[in-house]
Curated annotation (Swiss-Prot):
Cofactors named for this entry: Mn(2+)
Entry's EC annotation: 4.1.1.32
Transmembrane segments: none
Enzyme active site: 277
Positions contributing to substrate binding: 85, 224-226, 275, 400-402
Name the UniProt record assigns to this protein: Phosphoenolpyruvate carboxykinase [GTP]
Residue segments, region Disordered: 395-414
GO biological process: cellular response to glucose stimulus; gluconeogenesis; glycerol biosynthetic process from pyruvate; oxaloacetate metabolic process; propionate catabolic process; response to lipid; response to starvation
Localization annotation: Cytoplasm
Claim: Metal-binding is one of the keywords in the record: yes
InterPro entries: PEP_carboxykin_GTP_CS (IPR018091), PEP_carboxykinase_C (IPR013035), PEP_carboxykinase_GTP (IPR008209), PEP_carboxykinase_GTP_C (IPR035077), PEP_carboxykinase_GTP_N (IPR035078), PEP_carboxykinase_N (IPR008210)
Family of the protein in this entry: Belongs to the phosphoenolpyruvate carboxykinase [GTP] family.
Residues that coordinate or bind Mn(2+): 233, 253, 302
Length: 622
């Protein structure tokens, strides 16, 4: 292929296996704008990964961990100003403001492009531009889509190799004219000739920008996680949700798990929870005592792409894939007791970010073990001891510290996790963290009622005082920070999809709402959670099979005490009543809060939701 020659821009050195002229022209255009010192086309090989990691170790960005403790694993410590997603600097630049809706930040696309062109002009001087091709989902899957990220961060290149199917094989799928989502990322810290780099370059000015109509992502100023690994939330949720709206499918902030009965029948569920509600723990659940022969397997812990198609019997079903190939998990709180499978996944080939370093070259974080080591180097590179922590309250690991680990290493990984066809979804589960009001589990009576439950779900942001409800942050479908278009239109999309499926005679998944976090009068959790959540999962399967009647109440159907399997757990009918009960007064208050959410979204809100609310109110007043 002819190599474009440009003034002051390095040779593109396009590999012969890249046959996509539009892609090459785009790389050339971005290189001309950002002016890197060189362009490197990532091939996704182990050799390339090892070389980039070695270069980052030499630069002080990574520290290699003790191979006897964590084989082929590294620790990165970020700049203290660059530790999390920046929601206030995240923009959806649709042509019309109303298409972004009231829950997203919006700027007119032409104005934003002008801003970005100024910021990106020369932003990669002295650095390498890495061309990172990746498939979200198994290569060639009808549910998968391809992206290419141009980044000046080798940290991004190596993390993308773990988190996605990244490398040369992507170009085989892309061919000469395949579709791809263009993603441009810079840490925003150009280097002058001879200037010494810092271990974690970033810029106080940050922009994470999505152009839904042209399916583009531009990210400036952050090297961290979801701001920089653009396949994750930016593509897999914000851009993909708009693709799903336009093309008739779903991109969801959901785990996917499989449940296999002792008889060998497997069911698949997709579940949405806001942060701090135990999503990864649920995805990797280990069945408790009393469930011999049952098996739970993990397909994904964070994102599901779901498309309708016919099964072998000609029945339309919803099929889901995990578009990712790795876990980008929050480290604190992950330990052998809370998530054995996650800990087993982290034994080798992991990149840790902002956790603490032990004196023998391993990692540690709060919640990993009951007793912390006597001495650590904390996430900011400072000495840390339990005494210092007691005195100052300083954490050894940052609360949002992370691990990037290959999904294939997870002991509970589902044999179908890499199946290009996806798995048929039998049920959707939605849940939040509520100390009162919301029962342990409720099944929606129909699709619209299920969408209503998901649209109004939320989590408490403060610990509720006794007799008071905490402040509830609504997080519809756990998608509030991640929906790439108007949230009210998103509700309408779910309703429309359900309607279309029902009209085609499709088998609709059941919809359940759960809450593991009810508290008693003393403020203690009543439900034991973790592996015991299997008991609720089993009841859902019984409902799918028509084997459990449940009790119908104002808001749907919940289990009777005797319908849950209690073998191996001492949990009384009185305790069960505390987690399943409905308080009419609390629910009147709750419905008032639902009205506030609907008022915020009134402009595009589908009429079916206020109608569902009116039916609930009528039942409540009964």
């Amino acid at each position: 292929m002819n190599q474009p020659v440009m003034q002051g821009v390095p040779a593109l050195n396009v590999p012969a296996y890249v046959k996509h002229a539009r892609l090459v022209a785009w790389v050339s255009e971005i290189a001309a704008l950002t002016k890197p010192e060189r362009v490197v086309w990532c091939d996704g090989s182990q050799e390339e990964y090892d070389r980039l990691c070695a270069e980052m170790v030499a630069a002080g960005t990574l520290k290699q961990l003790n191979p006897a403790k964590r084989k082929n694993s590294y620790l990165a410590l970020s700049d203290p100003s660059d530790v999390a997603r920046v929601e206030d600097r995240t923009f959806i630049c649709s042509q019309k403001q109303e298409d972004a809706g009231p829950t997203n930040n919006w700027t007119a696309p032409a104005e934003m492009r002008q801003t970005l062109n100024g910021l990106f002009d020369g932003c990669m001087r002295g650095r390498t531009l890495y061309v990172v091709p990746f498939s979200m989902g198994p290569l060639g899957s009808p549910i998968a889509h391809i992206g290419v990220e141009l980044s000046d961060s080798p940290y991004v290149a190596v993390n993308m190799r773990i988190m996605t199917r990244m490398g040369r094989a992507v170009y085989d799928v892309l061919g000469a004219d395949g579709e791809f989502v263009p993603c441009v990322h810079t840490v925003g810290k150009p280097l002058a000739a001879g200037e010494q780099d810092v271990p974690w370059p970033c810029n106080p000015t940050k922009y994470i920008v999505h152009f839904p109509e042209t399916r583009e992502i531009w990210s400036f100023g952050s090297g961290y996680g979801g701001n920089a690994l653009l396949g994750k939330k930016c593509f897999a949720l914000r851009i993909a949700s708009t693709m799903g709206r336009d093309q008739g499918w779903l991109a969801e902030h959901m785990l996917i798990l499989g449940v296999t009965s002792p008889e060998g029948k497997t069911y698949h569920v997709a579940a949405a929870f806001p942060s701090a509600c135990g999503k990864t723990n649920f995805a990797m659940l280990i069945p408790p005592a009393g469930f011999d022969g049952w098996k739970v397997t993990t397909i994904g812990d964070d994102i599901a792409w779901i498309k309708p198609r016919q099964d072998a019997n000609g029945q339309t079903r919803l099929y889901a894939i995990n578009p990712e190939a790795g876990f980008f998990g929050v480290a604190p709180g992950t330990g052998e007791k809370t998530n054995f499978n996650a800990m087993a996944t982290l034994k080798e080939n992991v990149i840790f970010t902002n956790v603490a370093l032990t004196d023998d070259g391993d990692v540690w974080w709060e919640g990993m073990t009951d007793t912390p080591p006597a001495h650590l180097t904390d996430w900011q590179g400072q000495d840390w001891t339990p005494a210092i922590a007691k005195e100052t309250g300083r954490k050894a690991a940052h609360p949002n510290s992370r691990f990037t680990a290959p999904a294939a290493q997870c002991p509970s990984i589902d044999p179908e996790w890499d199946n290009p066809a996806g798995v048929a979804i039998d049920a959707f589960i939605f849940g939040g963290r509520r100390s009162t009001t919301v029962p342990l589990v409720t099944e929606a009576r129909d699709w619209t009622e299920g969408v209503y439950m998901a649209a109004t779900m939320g989590s408490e942001t403060t610990a509720a005082a006794v007799g008071q409800q905490g402040v509830v942050r609504r997080d519809p479908f756990a998608m509030l920070p991640f929906c790439g278009y108007n949230m009210a239109d998103y509700f309408a999309h779910w309703l429309k999809l359900g309607d279309q499926l029902a009209k085609s005679g499709a088998e609709l998944p059941k919809i359940f709402c759960v809450n593991w976090f009810r508290k008693d009068e003393q403020g203690r959790f009543v439900w034991p959670g973790f592996g015991e959540n299997m008991r609720v999962l089993k009841w859902m399967i019984d409902r799918i099979e028509g084997q459990a009647r449940g009790d119908e109440h104002v808001f749907g159907v919940s289990p009777r005490y005797e319908e849950l399997r209690w073998d191996g757990l001492d949990f009384s009918a009185e305790q069960f009543a505390k987690v399943i009960s409905l308080d009419a007064q609390a629910w009147q208050q709750e419905l008032t809060l639902h009205a506030e959410l609907f008022a915020q979204l009134a402009h595009h809100l589908p009429q079916a939701l206020p109608e569902a609310k009116a039916r609930l109110e009528a039942r409540l007043q009964g």
